């Protein structure tokens, strides 16, 4: 019922926008009983497509495409499946991996953006990248049973990738290899903290990260086209941050180093960042707007594991 209401609301809104364009300057007062009933099936295909693209993936697959033949035909068009957001799909009861594979098949090789926040297996990632050579934006979370090898094998097949968002636990990624495999990379988000801990770190006590500039140096050496960088909960120091600023000359739009408590953003480094970066998020800035969440226990385990591996 909620899905039908959402669909009807979008349809009515789109139709109203179109009718407003055709109205003359004369004011017309029509009684509700006299208004023409809209035949949604007869809407122009481009208008129907515009409406459908505003729906969630599950709304399209479970409802919209079943309404009529015309809509089913539009829903099968590869252009409907260029940009896919699957972040909120876990609230539904279905075979998530099968649905992802079906969406990739519907795109017919034209998938450009996909965002999957939870539970991607090595085999699913491989299925996506093997059939989406033009992919420009990938957002995934890395939990078991994903493996380092599976993640690296997948990402290294995406030479046109411009945006990479990764949420990982104890997996150590070879960022230098990723940078060389994805030379067009402009946005990197590598986050090591979930919002539950970020909002209230006092729940588990402060667990300092070991100083480690490996990620920072790898980024500096292999990602010269970066414009947006987010490293949350990373162990980099001032040395690593300076290396990034040196190696990424186009990094001017956005730099987010919240929860990177080994950075002391003062003096010349602070001046350098303030002068160059349009949007700077500091280590102690609020994370209230952080949209992703993993459990506190997972983050604590990640921090402990990182100390011994």
From Swiss-Prot:
Q: Where are the stretches annotated Disordered?
A: 1-26
Q: Which Gene3D superfamilies match?
A: 1.20.1280.50, Ribonuclease Inhibitor
Q: Name one Pfam family in it.
A: F-box-like
What InterPro entries does its record include?
Answer: F-box-like_dom_sf (IPR036047), F-box_dom (IPR001810), LRR_dom_sf (IPR032675)
| Signal peptide limits | none
* PROSITE patterns with a match to the protein in the record: FBOX
The F-box domain covers: 37-84
Descriptive protein name? Putative F-box protein At4g05475
